[in-house]
Structure formats: C-alpha cells, structure tokens
C-alpha cells in the first residue's frame, strides 16, 4: 500500500491492518501518475510503472483492500468530510455482497466523520432508482443511446443536487444532518 499525500504525512493510516504502508509526498513530478494509478483497475487496466518518489514497481488503484477505506479518523482533530455514493461504510471489497457485511454499522473510528451521500429520495428520481455504474453497460447492452440518455438525466439530477448542496452550505440546516 502506497499513500500519496500533500502536506505533512498523517498518522491516520498507521498499522491498523496486515498490509504495510509507504507514504510518498505528492508533487508536480508525480501527481499525474499517482492520480492515473488511483483509477487503474487491477487486472483490467495496465499499471502505472515507477512513479517518481516511490519505490520502483507497478501501481494500481487500491480498491481491492481499501475500498470503503476504514481508517482511524477519530485520531484526527476536527471533522473529516467523506463524500460517498452510499450512506454507510463497509470496509473491504471482495466480500461486500455478503449480507452480514452489507449492514451499516457504527464504528468508533468514524465518530468525527461527516459522510455525505445521496438520500433515498434523491436516488428515486434517477433512472433505475440508482446512480449510474459499470453494470449499466451490461444492463443496456448495445443500446448506447438509452444508456447515454439515462446517464445524462442522472447528471442533470446530480447538478441539481450540487446546487442544493451549495445552497445548504450558504445557509446550513443542522436538522438535515443524520448520524451514521
């Protein structure tokens, strides 16, 4: 596991699991490769090789072990903003579909986390009542026009959501904040 970071390295990702951790400062010489690697899907995409500042090797997205990353955020001062596409954190990835793994649970490491996620009411306004995802390529098959139409509708709803979020930030309403 390699974490590319800006500013002083955080102790947030210290040994909390069995995987090692190397920190690399992000700079103009490695930011493009680090961002590209963060979107390179293991087994599907080619790796980014030998990122400047890091040990030589191949780099992919860490989603296999760090998807829905659960770190000891409570070690940090203040509130940690966690924009996400679902209203809960399920650490791990490969076993996420197991019923006992999918249930949202409170965790002490999330005590100071403000998770921002779409509401059920928002999702109900989207085509298929969900955010677009890679499964849509299977669902729509070769009907690209329908997939694009529905994705554009979802984008328009997301833009409305962004406008509403900006309005909320201008005039916060704590009554709309929910606990994890």
Residue ranges and their predicted role:
Residues 1-180:
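Patatin-like phospholipase
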